[in-house]
Amino acid sequence: MTAIYKKELKSYLTSMIGYLFMAFTLALFGRYFTAINLQQGYPEIGYALQNSAFILLIAVPVLTMRVLSEEQKNKTDQLLLTAPVKISDIILGKYLALLTIYVIPVLIMCLYPLLLGTHGTVSYAVSYTSILGYFLLGAAYISVGVFVSSITESQVIAAVVGFVILFLCYVESGIANFFPEGAGSSFFAFFIIIALVCLWIGSMIKNPIITGVIAVIGEGALTTVYFTKSTLLEGKIQDLLGVFNMAGHMDNFVNGILDIGGVVYYLSVIAICTFLAMQSLQKKRWN
């Protein structure tokens, strides 16, 4: 894993993409820092971080688009897959290299509360808790980008799909408002979701019988709940969509609350996405 980490980190530090990512991230944060903290005199940097976080929707997919897609396009992924190295080491090595690139601007942001402290009273606990939330949000976004890059050999497709996924998560609250809170809308939405999940499982295991059994059990259980106790489904599609609201979990950190639930949430997103990337790569190894 160390060799892969060093190789990947070097590739980003010897090309423009890593430096452009850091420059754009710091530039947009600096703009909001100037407007909110310097011009308006706000003593904590949480709101500047929260407002500038949307740049990650664009910057992260651009940063991560090549991490695995380029290997597949150049066929160098075959060297990795046939080498005596674990799939987990490949994914984690690449993910940690990307995280290192992201950590550099975050560490620079840690200097801003000290700058504010020279001009007045600053709650360092609130500011650095906000930075922690910002770091975890970006780390989760990067894991999504790594997973998307693992399923396509096109860097452009990886960047576009990554942006679309992160953008949909960003506007989740607006999407949730389109759905009525009644049981019928939840039933319809979950019916489609179960079907899509079964299609994905079928593409992974290549066994139509097992896939069909899973589909029948899932759709059957959902239908039974709907016709026997539909109240259990009321508002559940909104609850499900809320799970994908990654940016929303940053709110408590911005308010100076060290939200353990938020930390667990972000770590769970990272674990799930890196696991899915490992499974995607594992499938290619056996193919």
Tell where the protein language model's regions lie, with residue ranges.
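Hydrophobic alpha-helical transmembrane segments
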Residues: 1-71, 99, 111, 127-132, 159-160, 200-215, 222-236, ...
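Helix-capping/transition residues at the boundaries of transmembrane alpha-helices
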Residues: 11, 69, 80-82, 141, ...
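Secretory targeting signals
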Residues: 29-36, 40-55, 97-164, 170-181
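Transmembrane helix segments
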Residues: 32-35, 155-252
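Alpha-helical transmembrane segments of polytopic membrane proteins
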Residues: 50-53, 130-137, 183-194, 213, ...
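Helix-loop-helix units of permease transmembrane domains in multi-pass membrane transporters
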Residues: 67-97
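Alpha-helix N-cap/helix-start motif at helix boundaries, enriched for small hydrophobics
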Residues: 88-92, 148, 281
